[in-house]
Amino acid sequence: MNIREMLEKIEFDTLAPRAAKSAETRGRDRDEPEDDLRPSYQRDRDRIVHSKAFRRLKHKTQVFLAPEGDHYRTRLTHVLEVTQIARTIAKSLRLNEVLTEAIGLGHDLGHSAFGHAGEAALNKLVKGGFDHYRQSVRVVEVLENDGRGLNLTVEVRDGILKHSKGEKGELLRRRPKSRALTLEGDIVRISDIIAYVNHDIDDGIRAGLLGENDIPKDIRTALGRTGSERIDRMVRDVIAATLACDYDAIMMSPEVLQALEELRTYMFQNMYLTPTVRGEFEKAQRILTMLFEYVTAHPEEFFGEKNEEPVERLAIDFIAGMTDRYAINLYERLFVPRAFV
């Protein structure tokens, strides 16, 4: 028995019956020899961490565009916070931590520059729309590794695809067919919003857009006064509610779920859609729109002559992969006059 097989046996011996087991993965698009050290989900986690798309997240916006302060979140710090919360829940429920971590680390790989402002801009430009979760799957299936993708397992790709909620989407999917294939995937989905509503409040306070006591009193009473209190309350509630339903689904109690939905609505109304934030979003959208128009009009400058993909698809992949800094620098090079002396 090699090390991988020992680790797989430990999973069967220690994890809950509903936990995803590495040895029972639905597999990959392309068959590969098994590794003698690492189970399948660990290999997926490692591939994501070593990918170029993962490294670029450190220069992509979470909420505030190119913030000058050192302590504002980026897309990378968001991903790490989501993953930490998700692993805490998975460990407490005896679910597969490594699968949870792989999905958490990979869930935003396809996010565009300038956060949701960039996503909204690209959504208007491409036929069929643009969603960061579908682009994240495209990154791991096609774009990484010089067009070969990362060849991740079905469970990781499914968790990445089904993590997103948007402004009004269900926090917990009610219909079984709409849920992730694994409980671990649904853990990342709920951990995503637990992370972002709380760290975005922290960034909003730092930016002077919010005060801690601005959050409605009933929400603070239900969830907690500080970010750490709210995260602790929600994490414990997910664990307790999931245990109470005997792992039928990843759950929250009705009162905490309602308070979280109200907090999300509050954040959209009082931060994400405020004139200050929207004004910067509109600038970012203009940058990406002009870049898209230029790139599609001059594809030979960026993609060469030989490429089977449609120009619009190439342009979207190119622009979605940009960091904020790269997009701004390219915009300045293409559209801002430079002094000759």
Residue spans for each PLM region:
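Histidine-centered, transition-metal-coordinating active-site segments
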Residues: M1-V79, T83-I89, N96-E97, F130-V341
